Amino acid sequence: VANARPEALRAAITPRTKLLILPYPNNPTGAIMDRDELQAIANVIRETNIMVLSDEIYNSLTYGPDRHVCFAEIDGMKERTIVVDGFSKSYAMTGWRLGWAMGPKELMRHICKIHRLAHGLCLRPQGAHP
């Protein structure tokens, strides 16, 4: 992800592009982008109607003097970004599968509806399995 090239991103976007998935910081290196690199990506996004899904689960696992900047903090990106994060990586809670998402209110309302239907245990079949 580091050293992202705006021209390559711009060239990859087609009329069918709806979402940019931004796994940042990157695993396993902890590589991060500085604010200027994120701003360059945001400038390309502003030219389109696409949303950004920013996977920031490794945000506290960065090394060196630079710190993580949330993509939603970049001017004009808050209303176009869904940030997903969790506790398992930063707090050594592997296996707990605890996470969260934040984004534009109306979009999150729909995401929560889908989550309620799609996430959960099907107890009857699991209870019948030896």
Please place each PLM-identified region on the residue numbering:
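Residue-level marker of structural boundaries
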Residues: 18, 38, 116-120
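Hydrophobic residues in well-ordered beta-strands that form the structural core
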Residues: 21, 52-54
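Short, surface-exposed helix-loop/turn micro-motifs enriched in polar/charged residues
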Residues: 1, 49, 118-122
